């Protein structure tokens, strides 16, 4: 078996990636989320494939085809709710994975980090298009509002929006192309994940101390395969509790009403995992400014290696920046809450304050805190 594992051209690649891979001996459970994201992607592709067998991407039948899946297809209700809540679990793992990367300074592995940002954009695009497919009220109006943002682009905006719509409004052509993109993107994401891993294995994993761990490595299997398995069991347990006991808790009741272009829902809002970005978008009174802030809210992650001023990599031994980090986490939770609230006092001013705080903490306060810590520890 050892001979095949180390000599066979295909199995050799798997061996070097998941079995004999040298891994730091001290990585914590925060390093489990990579494998959990792989599991989430596999669940989404499998459940999505079975849903696509019964779904029809036509405005007249899309809503009823989803109802048909839930009522008439064997375990269709389970597949549908696994897919819908699987997206939420995917984003929970994504946010924790990115948060870990920021906390422990993993953004200093620039190629891996940038590939991760591209992956984040791809997953967000996929999730947005997936939300449109059931063709409920929030699907239709969410698609209308978000695609309409592109009209803020000077000169080509209106033409671009009509080109994406395939007409003068969100309609049959839009739904068909969104289904096509929603189907193909997860496979593109899978390819990007392999590139993400390729870049990661060039440098090796980071660890909680932020120090070089070349002198103290252990094989990935069996140590981290067992450790990842525990994470998998916990995730699956949480996932099945969510899916089987509270399947609609993260959804919007408006999406159980078929799409009606003549009736606007009182509060148009995206799924919970986009609310922080939606709050930042809404907090700027100018349309183009809002769109730029929306994109920058994610793209700012690409600036993190440039904004790193500390002589230490991780926040493990940096109490001032740690405080800034946890304020940032709290700020993101506030933005998520505000994104789901109506546009009225006091939510407008809270959203604007939280949006300013978000960019200020990342671009100004954390770099300054890093420099202060250098001086305190005399690391200049």
Swiss-Prot record:
It is found in: Mitochondrion inner membrane. It is a multi-pass membrane protein. This is Cytochrome b. The gene is MT-CYB. A ubiquinone binds at residue 201. It comes from Microtus tatricus. Component of the ubiquinol-cytochrome c reductase complex (complex III or cytochrome b-c1 complex) that is part of the mitochondrial respiratory chain. The b-c1 complex mediates electron transfer from ubiquinol to cytochrome c. Contributes to the generation of a proton gradient across the mitochondrial membrane that is then used for ATP synthesis. InterPro entries: Cyt_b/b6_C, Cyt_b/b6_C_sf, Cyt_b/b6_N, Cytb/b6-like_sf, Cytochrome_b, Cytochrome_b_C_euk/bac, Cytochrome_b_N_euk/bac, Di-haem_cyt_TM. The cytochrome bc1 complex contains 11 subunits: 3 respiratory subunits (MT-CYB, CYC1 and UQCRFS1), 2 core proteins (UQCRC1 and UQCRC2) and 6 low-molecular weight proteins (UQCRH/QCR6, UQCRB/QCR7, UQCRQ/QCR8, UQCR10/QCR9, UQCR11/QCR10 and a cleavage product of UQCRFS1). This cytochrome bc1 complex then forms a dimer. Keywords: Electron transport, Heme, Iron, Membrane, Metal-binding, Mitochondrion, Mitochondrion inner membrane, Respiratory chain, Transmembrane, Transmembrane helix, Transport, Ubiquinone. One of its GO terms (biological process) is mitochondrial electron transport, ubiquinol to cytochrome c. CDD domains: cytochrome_b_C, Cytochrome_b_N. Heme b b566 binds at residues 97, 196. The chain crosses the membrane at residues 33-53, 77-98, 113-133, 178-198, 226-246, 288-308, 320-340, 347-367. Binds 2 heme b groups non-covalently. Heme b b562 binds at residues 83, 182. Belongs to the cytochrome b family. Its cofactor is heme b.
